[in-house]
Every structure is written in C-alpha cells, then in structure tokens.
Amino acid sequence: MRTDNDQWDITISVGQTALFVAASRALEARKPHPLAVDHYAEVFCRAAGGDWVAAVEGTDPEHPLQTEFGVDFVNFQGARTKYFDDYFRRVADAGVRQVVLLAAGLDSRAYRLPWADGTVVYELDVPKVLEFKREVLRRHGATPTAERREVPVDLRDDWPAALRANGFDASQPSAWIAEGLLIYLPADAQELLFAGIDALSAPGSFVAIEESAPMPMDVFEVKRAEALASGDPNSFFALVFNEQCAPGEQWFSERGWTASTTTLNECLHEVGRPAPAPDSEAAQMTGSISLMWARKG
C-alpha cells in the first residue's frame, strides 16, 4: 500500500507500471496495422529482462497481457498513445517549443516524434526511473530528436522549482502531459499539480491529461482489500487512489483554458478498435477513463 514518502525504481511499485505499459506499446507496435509505433518500448522491456521479455515475445500464455484483459489493454494503450502523439503534433504546429512530460516514465517521445528545431523536452520523474531510461537508451545508441533535459524530482515535492532550475521559461508557451499519472495521486496532489501547470503556463500553452472517474468507494475498498490480501505490493489496486479533485475540463475551463474531452471508448471507436465487452474485466477501467487537451488563452 502507498505511503506519503514511498520510493521506487523501475521494477517495483509505481515504477513497474511503466514496464507494463511499455510492454503493451511493444505489442501494439508488432501488429500489422499499429495505431502507434514505439520501437523503444520493446528495448526497455528486454533491458528489464525476465517476464518482460516473455511479455513482448508472447511466449508466456499466463502473462496478463496474453489474456482477454491484455488484448483490451493493448488496444487501450494503442489508442491512448495515438491520441497524445496527435496532440503533440498539434502543439508543434502551433509553434510551442517547450514540452513537459510529467512522470515521464518510459515515454520515448523525445526520441521518436519529429520535433521542430529548438524544441526542449523536459522529463520529470524520480531519479532511479530516469537513470534506467537514460542508460538503456544510451546502450541502444538512441539519439533524441529534440533537446532532452532530465528533471529528477518526485511530483510530491517542489517540482516547479526543479523545472525552472533546469531552464524552463514560464514566460514562453509550453505543452504539458499527464498520461497515466493522476490515478497514482490523491485528490489534493492532483489539485496542486493542476495549479502548478496553470501557474507556469503562458498564454498559448497546452495541456493534455488522462483521467479516471472514481469508482464507487465500496467497490474500490473490496478490490483494494483483495490486492493487499494477495501479498503482492505491486498489485494495481494497492498502488492507485480512487480520487479526483475535479474533471480536468471543468478545472482548466474555470481558469481560462479552452478544453476538449473524449472518453476512451469514444477514442477506441474513432480509431477502429473495439471497446471491451460490457462484462469483461477491462470494461470498468476503460469506461471510466477520459482523455482531455486544452489551450490557455
């Protein structure tokens, strides 16, 4: 179960969820007609070794990504990745040259998207996650397509100061992303995160988030109790918070941003992928998720 000052690397707790997502992106990239291609996702999984290699090779039929849930989850990751990739292309076309990846994890967009000259990508995450990513990509010989600046910081600490210390200019437009992040923050921390984004964003800035509507608390408590009883500290329901400070579109619209939200199931439909069956394990998850982007001013 999470604590106020818990720490992690790429193999435990919140950190290992980045590998699960990377394995999903790797499986999406292997499809005949992928929604998004992230070749580095498989590189990360192979570097982590063990079950993660089996996950991307599909050689372990018991791995969660080989189940019905896994098929739905890979579709989810393909659609989500495409949504945010398209967002960053709009951002680049609008002339924004500062990009901030909050809880960057194993996001490889600084290496795989065609950024305009002069773009700086700031990657915020805990030091051990950034170290793993840096070393794996260095050994692979990867070269970023923008100037990449690591900002080793826990988002529960003073991350705005750390971002500024690494050269971020709040007087210039910026583009932000919180992908796969908010469920790991309690509502008060979400509020602080949104406020920090708003305070550092000049007119013409953009933000994109993935958010989940909380499930009924009695349902969540049962799932959390089952997760804790399993003895697996990395179980999903032992890591997440069932909280939301406010729907993102509402929060940012009240502060002068123009926002647009789509549900994940709508996004799946738009890209030609099926939503999970109503009685499936993934249905509650995808049915609660929305994707939003907004522009300030």
Swiss-Prot record:
E.C. no: 2.1.1.-
Similarity annotation: Belongs to the UPF0677 family.
SUPFAM superfamilies reported in the protein's UniProt record: S-adenosyl-L-methionine-dependent methyltransferases
InterPro entries: Ppm1/Ppm2/Tcmp, SAM-dependent_MTases_sf, SAM_mthyl_Trfase_ML2640-like
Gene Ontology BP term (one): methylation
General function of this protein: Exhibits S-adenosyl-L-methionine-dependent methyltransferase activity.
Keyword hit for S-adenosyl-L-methionine: yes
List of residues binding S-adenosyl-L-methionine: 125, 154-155
Name of the protein described by the UniProt record: Putative S-adenosyl-L-methionine-dependent methyltransferase MSMEG_0614/MSMEI_0598
Transmembrane segments: none
One Gene Ontology MF term: methyltransferase activity
NCBIfam families: mthyl_TIGR00027
Record keywords: Methyltransferase, S-adenosyl-L-methionine, Transferase
Organism encoding this protein: Mycolicibacterium smegmatis (strain ATCC 700084 / mc(2)155) (Mycobacterium smegmatis)
